[in-house]
Design a protein with these regions (language model features):
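Active-site glycine/GP-rich loop and adjacent strand/helix microenvironment
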Residues: 1-174
Length: 174
């Protein structure tokens, strides 16, 4: 689903009855608004799971989506430079941060100023090396995203904390 024609998106959900939706979290709230504008209880839709990414979102947004839509809401992390949205996704059982798909990517956290590799649990810049990409492999790609690597919970692969900022954030004063 795209960011436009929200009325049509609600109609498509009603007609095709999907179980899962993958949009930005802010657009899911717009879809909930449109359901309500049409006099339809969003919780009555066929949706059971929402996969949300492409923008930062808070735990309050997650709670609002889950309450208003009656679905589970999970986070997905990705970069178009690395392989699109499929780099890490949250486990529906724990919802405690995206689990990195370490069978495809080798994650590291580095000091953004020195490039020094930091141990798991330390905050720093997320770096990825692709392990299975053949035509255009990525080696130690600096994402500029600030986070921490944490032990896995639902699976054996490590998970990442929500991105807390960017190493190249700046404010321009005029």
């Amino acid at each position: 689903f795209g960011g436009g024609q929200t009325e049509r998106q609600v109609q498509l959900i009603q007609d095709f009855k999907p179980d899962i939706i993958m949009v930005t979290p802010s657009y899911m709230l717009a879809i909930a608004d449109e359901f309500e504008r049409q006099g339809i209880d969003p919780r009555s839709s066929s949706l059971r799971l929402g996969i949300f990414g492409a923008e930062p979102w808070t735990n309050d947004m997650r709670a609002a989506i889950e309450h208003r839509m009656g679905i589970d809401a999970v986070d997905i992390y990705g970069l178009s430079e690395v392989m699109g949205p499929g780099v890490a996704s949250e486990c529906i059982e724990t919802k405690d941060g995206p689990t990195i798909w370490e069978d495809h990517f080798y994650p590291e956290i580095i000091d953004p100023d020195t490039g020094e590799v930091l141990p798991d649990g330390e905050p720093g810049e997320l770096v990825f090396t692709s392990l299975t990409k053949e035509a255009f492999p990525i080696i130690r790609y600096r994402t500029r995203d600030l986070t921490r690597l944490l032990p896995g919970t639902a699976r054996s692969m490590r998970r990442m904390e929500k991105v807390t900022g960017r190493s190249d954030d700046m404010i321009i004063l005029r």
